[in-house]
């Protein structure tokens, strides 16, 4: 197995950034891995987080999965920002082109996976709902909620919505512009139902002591009511790496 750090000038972002890759042992024999996992970091994190804080290298080798870990701004919510950089375009187009152009990763949609934690979990579902034909399965770890309930009303990040330099203003302009857009996690579900979209398999997990546990339960109940099937798991734990380390392996085993 091998780990690669690719530092390069992104054409989409216009600055140097990093992508980290884990390749299972089979690639040393010239064979493609069984699947490719695009693995997203959380808010205030970076592309190295999964390598530093979990056993993702061991899991990649165990399940014969290549792992691609891009790096974005820690509060961008994987958006094409209204005032900033086009991170969603970067993720969904350039990162894929780099990974599939440079390395022997599996390029078949039925062998592509996406997952993330917290903000990255939101990003994983955003990618899967907005590009449903691209993945076989998607996992949202501790990032399962109505984004309007996070930033609006009495949400735990409502104060950030009032900050003119905060994530709402920079990423979307305002709550009004966020609501109903491709970044609105309720709209993903509603649009899929309206259009009869065939979605990838969906996996969600969270710690039962996580501060967003109730929000997650509310969102999953809404998905169920709308006929969107989500495989759900929970375990004791907070918003922490012990949960994400356990659940990313469970997802990898479940998705194959």
Regions flagged by a language model, labelled:
Residues 1-256:
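Non-catalytic cap/lid and distal C-terminal segments of serine-dependent acyl enzymes
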């Amino acid at each position: 197995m091998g780990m690669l750090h690719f530092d390069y000038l992104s054409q989409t972002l216009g600055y140097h950034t990093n992508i980290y890759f884990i390749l299972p042992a089979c690639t040393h024999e010239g064979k493609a891995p069984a699947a490719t996992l695009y693995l997203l970091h959380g808010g205030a994190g970076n592309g190295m987080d999964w390598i530093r804080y979990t056993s993702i290298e061991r899991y990649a080798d165990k399940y014969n999965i290549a792992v691609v870990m891009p790096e974005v701004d820690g509060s961008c919510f994987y958006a094409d920002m209204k005032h900033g950089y086009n991170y969603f375009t970067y993720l969904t187009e350039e990162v894929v082109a780099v990974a599939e152009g440079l390395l022997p990763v599996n390029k078949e949609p039925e062998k592509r996976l996406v997952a993330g934690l917290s903000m990255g979990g939101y990003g994983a579902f955003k990618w899967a709902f907005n590009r449903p034909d691209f993945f076989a399965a998607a996992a949202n770890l501790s990032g399962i909620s109505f984004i309007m309930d996070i930033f609006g009303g009495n949400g735990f990040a409502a104060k950030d919505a009032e900050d003119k330099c905060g994530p709402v203003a920079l990423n979307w302009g305002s709550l009004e512009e966020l609501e109903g857009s491709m970044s609105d996690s309720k709209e993903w579900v509603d649009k899929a139902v309206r259009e009869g979209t065939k979605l990838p398999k969906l996996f969600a997990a969270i710690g039962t002591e996580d501060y967003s546990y109730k929000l997650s339960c509310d969102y999953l109940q809404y998905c169920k009511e709308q006929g969107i099937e989500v495989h759900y798991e929970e375990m004791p734990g907070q918003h922490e790496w012990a949960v994400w380390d356990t659940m990313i392996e469970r997802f990898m085993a479940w998705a194959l």
